[in-house]
């Protein structure tokens, strides 16, 4: 039973991730992300459709139902709160945080979520700059003095003008501010370790340039290249 629930939650979170990245949530993409066979994904999606968690559209994309979206939001919220705890409190290395949070998201209780927002100094975004969704459901556990500030942070996240780094691909170096690093890059341990070692984190200003190998990010500490196929997963803002 636990494996069944975990599989459903993993699929829901993966669909949520794909939507965030601007990628159509197709069964083929889920198979790639979760390293599962096409028939396995099709069977699981069919079951989730019977459970009214999603529908398969005419273009074969997957559309979450209201119930499915609520569950996906809850799983992602737990995942990113866990990432905050693992990074800010426990001090786990960046390259290990995502995998560990994937375990915690399935076992974290609602009361723990409420306690985390009381303990954490930052809980509007994950340590990788991604918005933590569904925080309004935890508002009762947030001190009155902090509610207005949190709501302002949430509102600000919605109006930030961000672009996918792959949509810029500048032929000459330009300065950008890193805003977020999506989950698909977080599973690339060497890239995450490099981001951390070079001090390239959300809020950092770096130079960005397109190269033959991908997108090069550089600062005074050094340079790293993100492969072209992953460039969409780093969101940035141009610095005037």
Curated annotation (Swiss-Prot):
Going by the entry's taxonomy, the superkingdom of the source organism is recorded as Bacteria
Provide the GO MF annotations for this entry: DNA binding; DNA-binding transcription factor activity; protein dimerization activity; transition metal ion binding
Residues annotated as domain HTH dtxR-type: 1-65
Please provide the record's keywords in A-Z order. Cytoplasm, DNA-binding, Iron, Repressor, Transcription, Transcription regulation
- Subunit description: Homodimer.
Short name of one Pfam family for this protein? DtxR
Fetch the PROSITE patterns from UniProt: HTH_DTXR (PS50944)
Query: What InterPro entries does the database record attribute to this sequence?
Result: DtxR/IdeR_SH3 (IPR040767), DtxR_MntR_Metal-Reg (IPR050536), Fe_dep_repressor (IPR001367), Fe_dep_repressor_sf (IPR036421), FeoA_core_dom (IPR038157), HTH_DTXR (IPR022687), Iron_dep_repressor (IPR022689), Transcriptional_repressor_C (IPR008988)
Location comes to: Cytoplasm
Q: Which family does it belong to?
A: Belongs to the DtxR/MntR family.
Task: Supply the name of the protein.
Answer: Diphtheria toxin repressor
Q: Which gene encodes it?
A: dtxR
Q: Where is it mainly found?
A: cytoplasm
Query: What Gene3D superfamilies does UniProt report for this protein, alphabetically?
Result: 2.30.30.90, Iron dependent repressor, metal binding and dimerisation domain, Winged helix-like DNA-binding domain superfamily/Winged helix DNA-binding domain
């Amino acid at each position: 039973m636990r494996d069944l629930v975990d599989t459903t939650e993993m699929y829901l979170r993966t669909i949520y991730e794909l939507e965030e990245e601007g990628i159509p949530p197709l069964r083929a993409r889920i198979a790639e992300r979760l390293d599962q066979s096409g028939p396995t994904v099709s069977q699981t999606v069919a079951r989730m459709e019977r459970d009214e968690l999603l529908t398969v559209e005419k273009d074969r994309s997957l559309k979450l139902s209201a119930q499915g979206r609520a569950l996906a939001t809850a799983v992602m919220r737990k995942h990113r709160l866990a990432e905050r705890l693992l990074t800010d409190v426990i001090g786990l290395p960046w390259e290990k945080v995502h995998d560990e949070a994937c375990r915690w998201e399935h076992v974290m209780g609602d009361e723990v979520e409420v306690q985390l927002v009381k303990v954490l100094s930052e809980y509007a975004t994950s340590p990788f700059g991604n918005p933590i969704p569904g925080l309004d459901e935890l508002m009762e556990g947030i001190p009155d003095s902090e509610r207005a500030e949190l709501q302002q942070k949430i509102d600000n996240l919605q109006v930030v003008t961000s672009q996918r780094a792959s949509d810029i691909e500048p032929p000459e170096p330009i300065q950008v501010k890193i805003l977020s690093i999506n989950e698909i890059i977080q599973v690339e341990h060497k890239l995450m370790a490099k981001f951390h070692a070079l001090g390239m984190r959300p809020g950092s200003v770096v130079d960005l340039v397109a190269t033959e190998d991908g997108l090069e990010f550089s600062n005074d500490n050094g340079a790293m290249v993100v492969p072209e196929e992953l460039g969409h997963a780093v969101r940035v803002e141009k610095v005037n």
